[in-house]
């Protein structure tokens, strides 16, 4: 009997006074689900003979991704033509490759990022009226990290429904992620049943598994939530979700980073750590290593968990390791701390389960996700992970690259423009200050030293420069005249209509609060329909590279846009004052440049909150988030 099983059995005995037996014992559950191929646990399959188990990153795009992007382009092209015509702009001579990147930051990031996405959806009446709705149909790639990965997984698995529709009909984010309002026992016993089944097969199980299943039970389609059959794998999405099967949605990418152990035993999450990608087709990285970079590699994600040695399976193959909930949990291991806080609190069902995990793993392994190393003994001369049993992954936001730009910056993907949604907790009052972009730029300089591991990141100002220049309060274009890089359209969160600077650790939101978060995120992209020229300038930035424009041949309209919205290269590095934007206000830069028609003339404004400083909301948000977390921990069963 495993240590997890023993602890769980003891905790059940301690709670029988008010507990009821699990509704479905493990044996019955397996019978219900055939041979286990529909549960969270991986299942054994015959090893295929026609699979390329390792693909070197220097070979370009994988076949699955290439086919998807080719199919996507057929839908993207007419969508972009329509959006350009609506602005009176010329159709690009080639179809631009556009990406969106959603930052991390818990539910705050999920809601703010999906709000920004909603600002690009023609299904949103307000976005359509703001004349930015419809651009999502022109996007080829979508990357998400941590809370942004929850947005990615939920949006994609639900077929691209309007986020406000998901909030109304599916999400149960008003119930705490760790401490649900009701059904606690069934929730925790289901967590045990599913994770123990995976452990029984010899696969590593960690708090990430519990955390991922909890996330999935709040935002994934109901048939795949913990109370039903939590068996939705990332690789199955194109088969299960029609909108992904026919390439009607951008190709999703979820990001994590690796953690290394130095010789002295110190655990390290370096800013130049390896960035790992999960897509419906592959798992891998474009560049391996930290201090020394070498070309990376990819393996079919469908067979992740299979023991592979130098590119060949060791006789037994598996499917089902790539559960979407697990991938989302892996991208957000920072939140394992929500469960770690249970250690040492009042005895309870989940407390004993977590304690068992810690005893089995060691506390230095509690905030990680372990992936069986498919690249064992592959390219051992250059591959720095060739001798590892597991790839150890953490929340990529812990590298300070809190916007997952890197997958969209690799030369192979030929991305022309990236809409970067930033809801990071950078400042004292939980607003972004450009740290994510600056960190990626500094990392790009390191990668540039190695020809096969480059990322094409334009220069951006320092964090102080972001704040002093007001770039963290309104959209800014970066890389405008550096034609070797994509144009980055930076969309920072701003309190257009709501105090969206809530705590990263706020683990539940009332529906009306979540709705306001979505709307505010949308208005950070649409500028609350207060800048008449913005829809045209947004279109210019998204398509600029496909015209091969420079300042010498850009259209008059688009050059005027770039003169207005592009970073001019200034970088005021002096220490700025605390950034404290006012709720329901217009960013001062828009007013100073006579761009805004004023909030009173814009739709959707909420005048009742005008003049409220966001600092109070931030303090209250942090307090409420931590109170909700610690109170729930104290009241555990």
UniProtKB/Swiss-Prot annotation:
Post-translational modification: N-glycosylated.
Stored SMART domains: PLAc
Leader sequence residues: 1-19
Organism annotation: Cryptococcus neoformans var. neoformans serotype D (strain B-3501A)
Gene Ontology molecular functions: lysophospholipase activity; phospholipase A2 activity
Coiled coil: none
PANTHER family, sorted: CYTOSOLIC PHOSPHOLIPASE A2, LYSOPHOSPHOLIPASE 1-RELATED
Cross-referenced InterPro entries: Acyl_Trfase/lysoPLipase, LysoPLipase_cat_dom
Glycosylation (residues): 50, 56, 122, 231, 246, 272, 314, 343, 387, 433, 481, 501, 528, 553, 572, 594, 606
Cellular compartments per GO CC: cytosol; extracellular region
Gene symbol of the encoding locus: PLB1
Any Gene Ontology biological process: glycerophospholipid catabolic process
Domain PLA2c: 46-572
Domain of life: Eukaryota
Name of this protein: Phospholipase B
Subcellular location: Secreted
Record's function text: Exhibits phospholipase B (PLB), lysophospholipase (LPL) and lysophospholipase/transacylase (LPTA) activities.
Keywords annotated in UniProt: Glycoprotein, Hydrolase, Lipid degradation, Lipid metabolism, Secreted, Signal
EC category: hydrolase
């Amino acid at each position: 009997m495993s240590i997890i099983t023993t602890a769980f059995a003891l905790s059940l005995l301690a709670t029988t006074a008010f507990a009821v037996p699990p509704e479905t014992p493990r044996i019955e559950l397996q019978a219900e689900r055939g041979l286990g191929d529909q549960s969270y646990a991986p299942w054994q399959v015959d090893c295929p003979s026609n699979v390329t188990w390792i693909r070197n990153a220097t070979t370009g795009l994988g076949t699955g991704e290439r086919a998807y992007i080719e199919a996507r382009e057929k839908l993207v092209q007419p969508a972009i033509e329509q959006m350009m015509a609506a602005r009176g702009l010329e159709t690009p001579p080639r179809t631009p490759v556009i990406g969106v990147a959603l930052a991390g930051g818990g539910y705050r990031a999920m809601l703010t990022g999906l709000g920004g996405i909603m600002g690009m959806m023609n299904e949103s009446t307000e976005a359509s009226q703001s004349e930015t709705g419809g651009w999502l149909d022109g996007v080829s790639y979508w990357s998400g990290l941590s809370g942004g990965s929850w947005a990615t997984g939920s949006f994609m698995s639900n077929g691209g429904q309007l986020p406000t529709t998901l909030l109304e009909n599916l999400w149960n984010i008003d119930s705490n992620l760790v401490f649900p309002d009701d059904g606690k026992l069934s929730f925790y016993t289901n967590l045990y049943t599913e994770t123990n089944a995976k452990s029984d097969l010899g696969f590593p199980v960690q708090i990430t598994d519990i955390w991922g299943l909890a996330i999935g039970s709040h935002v994934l389609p109901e048939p795949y939530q913990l109370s039903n059959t939590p068996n939705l794998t990332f690789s199955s999405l194109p088969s299960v979700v029609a909108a992904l099967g026919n390439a009607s949605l951008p190709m999703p990418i979820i990001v994590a980073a690796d953690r290394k152990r130095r010789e002295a035993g110190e655990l390290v999450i370096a800013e130049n750590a390896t960035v790992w990608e999960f897509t419906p087709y592959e798992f891998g990285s474009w560049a391996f290593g930290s201090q020394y970079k070498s070309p990376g590699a990819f393996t079919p994600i469908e067979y992740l968990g299979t023991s592979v040695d130098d590119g060949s399976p060791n006789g037994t193959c598996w499917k089902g390791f790539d559960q979407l909930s697990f991938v989302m949990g892996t991208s957000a291991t920072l939140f394992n701390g929500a469960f770690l806080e249970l250690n040492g609190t009042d005895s309870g069902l989940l407390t004993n389960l977590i304690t068992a995990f810690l005893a089995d793993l060691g506390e230095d392994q509690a905030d990680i996700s372990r992936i069986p190393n498919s690249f064992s003994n592959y390219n051992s001369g250059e591959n720095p992970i060739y001798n590892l049993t597991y790839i150890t992954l953490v929340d990529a936001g812990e590298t300070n690259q809190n916007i997952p730009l890197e997958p969209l910056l690799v030369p192979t993907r030929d991305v022309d423009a990236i809409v970067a949604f930033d809801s990071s907790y950078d400042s004292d009052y939980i607003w972004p200050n450009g740290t994510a972009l600056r960190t990626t730029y500094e990392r790009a300089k390191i990668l540039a030293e190695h020809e096969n591991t480059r990322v094409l990141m334009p220069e951006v100002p320092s964090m102080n420069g972001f704040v002093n220049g007001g770039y963290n309060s309104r959209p800014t274009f970066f890389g405008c005249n550096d034609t070797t890089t994509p144009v980055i359209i930076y969309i920072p969160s701003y309190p257009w209509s709501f105090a969206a600077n809530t705590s990263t650790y706020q683990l539940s939101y009332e529906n009306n609060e979540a709705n306001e978060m979505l709307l505010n995120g949308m208005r950070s992209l649409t500028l609350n329909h207060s800048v008449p020229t913005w829809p045209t300038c947004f279109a210019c930035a998204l398509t600029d590279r496909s015209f091969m424009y420079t300042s010498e041949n850009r259209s008059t309209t688009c050059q005027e846009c770039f003169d207005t919205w592009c970073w001019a290269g200034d970088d005021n590095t002096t220490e700025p004052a605390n950034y404290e934007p006012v709720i329901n206000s217009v960013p001062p830069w828009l007013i100073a440049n006579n761009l805004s028609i004023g909030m009173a003339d814009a739709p959707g404004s909420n005048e009742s909150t005008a003049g409220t400083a966001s600092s109070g909301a931030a303090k209250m948000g942090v307090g409420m988030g931590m109170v909700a977390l610690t109170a729930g921990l104290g009241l555990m069963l």
